Structures are given as C-alpha cells and as structure tokens.
Regions:
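Glycan-binding loop/region signatures in secreted carbohydrate-active enzymes
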Residues: 152-235, 261-264
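Short, acidic/polar
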Residues: 20-37, 89-98, 224-237
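Acidic/aromatic/glycine-rich contiguous surface patches that form carbohydrate-binding/processing clefts
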Residues: 228-266
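Substrate-binding surface in catalytic domains of secreted glycosidases
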Residues: 52-181
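Conserved, mostly hydrophobic/aromatic
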Residues: 46, 107, 148, 236, ...
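Substrate-binding cleft and catalytic face of glycoside hydrolase catalytic domains
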Residues: 1-49, 53, 65-83
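Feature responds to low-complexity, polar/acidic, surface-exposed segments characteristic
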Residues: 15-19, 265-278, 286, 291-339, ...
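Receiver (REC) domain switch/active-site residues of two-component response regulators
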Residues: 42, 105, 242
Length: 349
C-alpha cells in the first residue's frame, strides 16, 4: 500500500523505565537499529515521557546515538510534549527541541492532554494549545520537521465524585454514549472544541468505559469532532509545517478518513465526503477547474449555472482572457463571471 511503517518506542509514562532506558542508551540504540534492519522497517519514533530536565541531555544523546546507528534513509521521529509557554522544567523541560531536531527527521508535538486523568474537567486539545505549541516549535526547529499531534480521543468526568474522573475515551465511544443516553453536545467557539453531557439513570443499561460499567449520574465529556479537528488541520497550512499525526489509530470516528482525504488534497468541503463524485471533485479542484461555493461547501447536487459553466470551461481549456468594452450580452455587465463569459463567447463556446 506504499505506507511507511515506523513503530514507536515508549516507556508508557513510567519514569524509572525511561531513566533506565537512557542509562543504557548505547545498548538500546543498537537493539533498535538491529530490529529496524531485521524487520525492514522504515524507522522508529521515540516516545519517552514523564522525565525531567535532569534527563534532557541524556535524551538528546540517545537520539544522536540512534541517528549514528541507523542508515540515513531510515526515519527517526521524536514525540515531544506540547510546550506553548517554553517551560524548561519538569517533563516539558525534558525535551530540547533544538538539539533533538538536529538528530531527527521530525518532532511530533503531543498537543493534547491539556486536562488529564484525575484533574478538573476541561478541554483535551484547545485550538490555542495547538497553535501556540506550533509557534514555540518554529522558534527552535525548521518547519519541515514539525508534526502537529491531534487527538482522536477525549476524557470523561462524573459530576461530583466517583469513577471516572478524566479517564480517556475514544471519539468513537463518545458517539456511542451520547446516542445511548440521549446526551446533548455544545461547541465552544473560544477553545474550538466540543463538550457533551450525558445523564445515566438507575434503570439504564450500563455501558463500560475501560472495562468498568458507569453508574447513575451526570457526566461531562470533552472530546474532538470533525469541526475541531478540521480547525487544527488548517494550522498545518497556516504555518506550512510538515504535517500531522494522531493518538491513536482506532479511536477515530468512521468518517475521519473521509475528510482527511479531502484535507490532504487541499480542500475542506463538508458536503462531498461520501458523495459518489467525491474523487472527481477532488481531482477537478486540485487542477483548478472548479471552485467551491464557499471555502467549506461545494454543493455537489446543485444545478450548474451558465456563468459557472463558462468559468469552468475557460479554466479547463486554459483559454486566454478576453474582455470587451461592450459585451455582446446585455445582462452580464458587472457580473462576477463577465470576463469568463466574454472569453468563452470569443472562442465560440
């Protein structure tokens, strides 16, 4: 399928395990290089978390050693904490963006967990977290080495006390819970993220979260949806960075890859994702043959006007523009497509 396979190495937030790995970094780097060669992998992504500024230089040295041991064509990615305010202590301070960037192909900014398990309810990934994290990264590494991490999950809190308090929940599970318990959803235009509220009654069937049935009560869910993810995707173009990655595959909703395909082809039309002509629309849009009605709508089933047909044919045939002081037609003066209409007419179209 022409897909690069780059597995990730993680300590799963275990500080002692991460420290032990860095203490034996020469040996570990050798083992990773051997595995990449043995399984014909395309590289490795290093995701060591929950260390401190005390391990910063060791972390960088590990990536340097790994780069020396891997062939140049193999990819090295490093997952780094989102650091919108340039903190140099604690686990955010364990990543030297500038030095890591010199020895790796990209830094994957984990722009999520703004609020976390055991903490107060709140956004997992606000738009400001994503944007400020990109801005900080750009001050340290080239734009072509930056990936924006976008979550495919949210977190759920029970109002008051009791399980769960900020447990992770996939975007797919959110849809199920909201549907099952007839929940309500709202969208915050400031953080550009959705929040859902569900009420579980004593008599309701108890669905499970992380294997544990949820009890009666009111729950708040902060998560991601199509609108919030699309807004983050726009940041990729705004700052012209390498691209995006997500945590984690399998937690996304069924329609996610429909609009990711549109985004990867440079358009954000909300109304063509499952349309029978989607691929043709994308191709025509990429070739600049057709435009959208707005930036986010294409209106694929709307009838085509003569003006739109003229503009499309002029672009498709790459006809040189023609303008007349007095148009042959009495009803096109000042029309947005006047130039295209004149051009089409001059070519007997």
């Amino acid at each position: 399928r022409d897909i690069s396979v780059v597995p990730f190495l993680s300590n799963h937030w275990d500080r002692e395990l991460g420290q032990a790995a860095l203490a034996r970094r020469e040996e570990l780097a050798g083992q990773l290089a051997e595995a990449v060669e043995r399984y014909d992998l395309d590289g490795v992504n290093v995701d060591i978390e929950n260390l401190t500024e005390n391990e910063r230089d060791l972390h960088t040295d590990f990536i340097r050693i790994l780069r020396d041991k891997l062939p140049d064509e193999k990819i090295i990615g490093v997952s780094v904490a989102a650091n919108p305010y340039g903190i140099t202590t604690d686990w955010k301070g364990s990543y030297d963006y500038e030095s890591l960037g010199k020895h790796s192909d990209y830094l994957m900014i984990m722009a999520y967990d703004e609020h976390y398990r055991g903490g107060e309810p709140g956004t997992v990934a606000s738009i400001s977290l994503a944007e400020k994290s990109i801005q900080y990264a750009l001050s340290k590494v080239p734009k072509e080495k930056i990936l924006l991490g976008i979550p495919f999950y949210g977190r759920i809190w029970k109002n008051g006390s009791g399980f769960p308090q900020g447990v992770g929940i996939s975007n797919m599970e959110v849809q199920t819970l909201v549907s099952q318990y007839e929940g309500s959803a709202a969208f915050d235009p400031e953080t550009f993220t959705p929040t859902a509220t569900i009420k579980v009654k004593e008599k309701d069937e108890k669905l499970k979260i992380r294997g544990i049935p949820i009890g009666p009560g009111t729950y708040t869910i902060c998560y991601e949806n199509e609108l919030s993810i699309k807004q983050k995707l726009r940041l990729i173009e705004k700052y012209d960075i390498k691209g995006t990655g997500s945590w984690s595959l399998g937690e996304e909703t069924a329609d996610t890859w429909e609009y990711y395909k549109l985004w990867s082809n440079g358009c954000y039309f909300d109304d063509v994702g499952k349309h029978w002509a989607r691929d043709y629309i994308i191709k025509a849009y990429k070739k600049n043959w057709v435009m959208g009605v707005t930036q986010t709508t294409f209106c694929p089933d709307r009838p085509l006007t003569r003006a739109e047909a003229s503009a499309m044919l002029v672009r498709l045939l790459k006809l040189p523009a023609q303008f007349f002081e007095e148009s042959t037609f009495t009803d096109v003066s000042g029309h947005w497509a006047e130039g295209a209409i004149d051009t089409a007419w001059s070519h007997n179209i």
